[in-house]
């Protein structure tokens, strides 16, 4: 009789131990589900905050690109690295409203800045008599947003272009 009782207790203990494992697995799964839900909520909040800032910065300009300066100056050679480290690019306005947003930064700081003009650009804003490679092989925009050939060795306002792909 004791042998049957001990066997029963052993089986009950094994069953309870397995039950605890299952409870532990369920608890772990529930914890993971809760953590994923928190991450999803935090991601949605972060995305909303980012888009709010983006929309506020581009409000009234009609541009989906942001043009931001750190108020420093640089030669063209160092500009790509500066912008890249910040997650941006050298400005390359493709539309009039983008050039206007770029111009707003230049006008606010009363300084010129470098930009990149692609070979197949649909939009350009060259000043009269430009481009003129005698002035240099780089391109700068003045405080009115007009483009000029320029020396790549000029220290111009650092402006980087940022855009979002959603």
UniProtKB/Swiss-Prot annotation:
InterPro entries named among the record's database cross-references: C-type_lectin-like (IPR001304), C-type_lectin-like/link_sf (IPR016186), C-type_lectin_CS (IPR018378), CTDL_fold (IPR016187)
Subunit note: Homotrimer; non-covalently linked.
Organism per entry: Metlapilcoatlus nummifer (Mexican jumping pitviper)
Disulfides per UniProt: 83-160, 138-152
Principal subcellular localization: secreted
GO molecular function, a single term: carbohydrate binding
Signal peptide: 1-19
Residue ranges of domain C-type lectin in the record: 46-161
Location within or outside the cell: Secreted
Keyword annotations of the record: Disulfide bond, Glycoprotein, Lectin, Phospholipase A2 inhibitor, Secreted, Signal
Residue positions with a glycan: 122
Domain of life: Eukaryota
Family: Belongs to the alpha-type phospholipase A2 inhibitor family.
Coiled coil: none
Tissue expression pattern: Expressed by the liver.
Protein's job: This phospholipase A2 inhibitor neutralizes the activity of basic PLA2 myotoxins of its own and related venoms. The inhibitory profile shows specificity towards group II PLA2, either belonging to the catalytically-active (D49) or -inactive (K49) subtypes.
Protein name: Phospholipase A2 inhibitor anMIP
């Amino acid at each position: 009789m004791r042998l049957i009782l001990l066997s029963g207790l052993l089986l009950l203990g094994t069953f309870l131990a397995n039950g605890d494992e299952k409870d532990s697995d369920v608890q772990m799964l529930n914890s993971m589900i809760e953590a994923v839900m928190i991450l999803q909520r935090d991601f949605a909040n972060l995305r909303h905050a980012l888009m709010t800032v983006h929309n506020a910065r581009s409000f009234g300009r009609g541009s989906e690109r942001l043009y931001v300066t750190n108020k420093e100056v640089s030669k063209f050679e160092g500009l790509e690295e500066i912008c890249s480290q910040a997650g941006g690019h050298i400005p390359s306005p493709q539309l009039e409203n983008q050039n206007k947003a770029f111009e707003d930064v230049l006008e606010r700081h009363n300084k010129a800045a470098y930009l990149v003009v692609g070979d197949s650009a649909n939009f350009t804003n060259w000043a009269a008599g430009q481009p003129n490679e005698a002035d240099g092989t780089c391109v700068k925009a003045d405080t009115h947003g007009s483009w000029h050939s320029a020396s790549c060795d000029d220290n111009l306002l650092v402006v980087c272009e940022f855009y979002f792909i959603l």
